[in-house]
Regions:
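Glycine-rich beta-strand-turn "strand-cap" elements at beta-sheet edges
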Residues: 5-8, 14-35, 72-79, 108-133
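Generic structural signal for individual residues within well-ordered alpha-helical segments
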Residues: 7, 48-51, 96, 105
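Short, glycine- and small/hydrophobic-rich beta-strand elements in well-ordered beta-sheets
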Residues: 24, 59-84
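N-terminal targeting signals for Sec/Tat export/insertion, comprising classic cleavable signal peptides
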Residues: 35-60
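Short hydrophobic/aromatic beta-strand micro-patches
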Residues: 41, 74, 86-88
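Solvent-exposed loop/turn segments at secondary-structure junctions
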Residues: 45, 77-78, 90-94, 126-128
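An amphipathic, aromatic/His-enriched active-site/gating alpha helix that lines ligand/cofactor pockets
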Residues: 57-70, 88-122
Length: 133
């Protein structure tokens, strides 16, 4: 009976400790995340080509870079040349690594004459750790 009691207490303590450890790691990871918006205006005569290069870059980044958590691009419904990209990186190291990848460099070089304006907006998540389903 005493052994059962001791095992039960040990199990509860172990589960409690694991919860604190894993929740703490998640909290630290979320605090280190780099989240920003890239707001672009694209030359209307090159929009189709731009969208193709953007799609290729986003798909490659999310597929091969573990530090790229989200790249979600949207165009304004009534103004499709105005594009906003939600960028979420594990941390600034992941971002710095991302901009040195061959697929990002190909995107930047391929679109430099298509982009009329680019604004990078640094943000602070209001609900840190929120996952996109």
């Amino acid at each position: 009976m005493e052994i059962r009691k001791a095992l039960l207490i040990f199990s509860v303590l172990l589960i409690t400790m694991m919860t604190f450890v894993f929740c703490g790691q998640t909290s630290v990871q979320n605090k280190n995340q780099m989240v920003r918006l890239a707001k672009l205006v694209i030359d209307s005569t090159q929009l189709e080509n731009y969208n193709a290069l953007l799609k290729e870059e986003i798909e490659a980044s999310v597929r091969v870079e573990p530090g790229v958590l989200t790249l979600y691009a949207v165009a304004e419904k009534n103004n499709p040349t105005h594009i906003t990209i939600l960028e979420i990186y594990a941390d600034t190291v992941a971002y710095k690594s991302h901009i040195l990848t061959p697929h990002f460099i190909k995107y930047k070089n391929g679109t430099k004459d298509m982009v009329k304006s680019l604004e990078l907006v640094e943000t602070v998540p209001l609900v840190p750790g929120m996952k996109i389903k």
